[in-house]
């Protein structure tokens, strides 16, 4: 449970509440949306956990997609995680850090330049090797959970529930209806993203049949409760309209009840959380690229490791990619694009649950999804419904996301075809 909380909590809960309040407006709808997101995550984690326990190989969603749908779909899952799910999220976190640094400097300086400087700093940290970056992560992970609990507790203790007053409960966001839901859900799903990493523990858990539901659902529900408490704390000090105008709701909420100095302390504490969250991207992404290269799905140069154990070429590539995306300075656009692609790919991966049930019925499954087939079917139906709403309400963004998915699929088809041809030539040569 603690692992799930540590993985998931990060930039999302600090940067997105204002965006979500702006799209939804009503405090009860805001809380309902966060609750809905937590339920979807809990169900998704259980579906993925069955595949993770049955296929205990390194690679995560790439492995599940490859076994269910073949090498090309495995390529899509792996490269979409590398370029989009982790690359775009890393850029969004760098932009958020830049926004908060700009707050601390009195709104001086360029967000784009701050974001670039952040990426350069992380690049040099990770050239020092795995030990230095891991120690950094261990310290900041412990801090961020304490900070989130402290912010929620302070807001709940000192606030007067101003956001729930009758005068504001009838407010509606500027993007009401399906579009408002779609825009808000993209931000909420970004805040919960990381749940799929928690599911990877399935292969390492003793007695997965009894332990996994408690670990995975318990962890997801713990994150959901923390997020709901944070939002209640924010709404105790600010109206939805005040939240909507804020890039750092936590600071403004604490400042409203404790004063500006306390708000500045929250900015510094929030920076620690964001730095910890971005460190996960720089820590994991080069190793995702390394893993893809080991399977012949990425350039061989990515598999070269330096004396410190760092896949240096992969680190160069990832750092450059995140820095280029961060130069956009557009936090919300980055996460909207990221989640449109991620939800599409995750739908495909989760559908692999039923494909594996049919194609490999005798596969040993240490953990089986409770409520089969109804609960997994409901989970996938929710994803398909959400995806349909995203496409319907944001067709231009969906076209861009579709173009990227199509490009990755084409590259995957070419790569796997070449690999098949090379294997055939080797066989004939013998």
Regions found by a protein language model. Name each.
Residues 301-312, 346-397, 429-430:
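C-terminal membrane-solvent junction of multi-pass transporters and transport-like membrane proteins
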Residues 19-22, 41-119, 123-127, 270-291, ...:
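Hydrophobic transmembrane alpha-helices that form the core helical bundles
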